[in-house]
Amino acid sequence: MFAITAITVFSAMMLTSNTKAQAAAKKTYTITPKSSPYKGKYKKAKGYYNSTTKQYFAIRSYLELLEKKGGGKLVIKKGTYKIPNVLYIPSNVTIELKDGVTIKKIMKTKAKKMKPGGGIFELLEPSKAKKKGVYGQYNGVHDVKIYSTGKAVIDQDYQGKTGQNCIALVMCHNRNVTIEGITFKNMKYGYF
């Protein structure tokens, strides 16, 4: 019994050590309200990319990159980010909202081929966003942390039952999710 316990503890210590090493190797990316999408992705997407959707596509491109890299950290610097559609967050991702960040839901895209969506963030790999039934039980996105280093706001910009109604964060079949230090504003109807 003691030997099995020692092996179990040792295995857990090795797993923790490997996990810490992997986390340390994951890259950190930083964006501002003026940032362009990663490596220009989406900038030539006619009918989608414009001055209204620029911030959405900038954040989206980095979340897609983090999915491909197996995780990492996205630091969002001070400013207002207008989000017309859902941003999908993959596993092993940390999003740090710096002091003074506002994530504001908008319901206009000014894009011919892109309609606004009803949410802001969803814990789902971007590559699986259009697929149905990809998760069940607790096998969804995991190990996600969204936090603020000061005062950060997610503004759902509720406009009444006949106007805009938005879901700030959709979580289904997820585990190890941490949300800290963020003010959720203007959620008068609907869900968190």
Regions inferred by a protein language model and the residue ranges of each:
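Active-site-proximal or metal-binding-adjacent scaffold patches in catalytic folds
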Residues: 9
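Juxtamembrane cytosolic interface motif at the C-terminal end of transmembrane helices
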Residues: 12-16
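Extracellular/periplasmic carbohydrate-active domains that bind, remodel
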Residues: 3-6, 17, 24-192
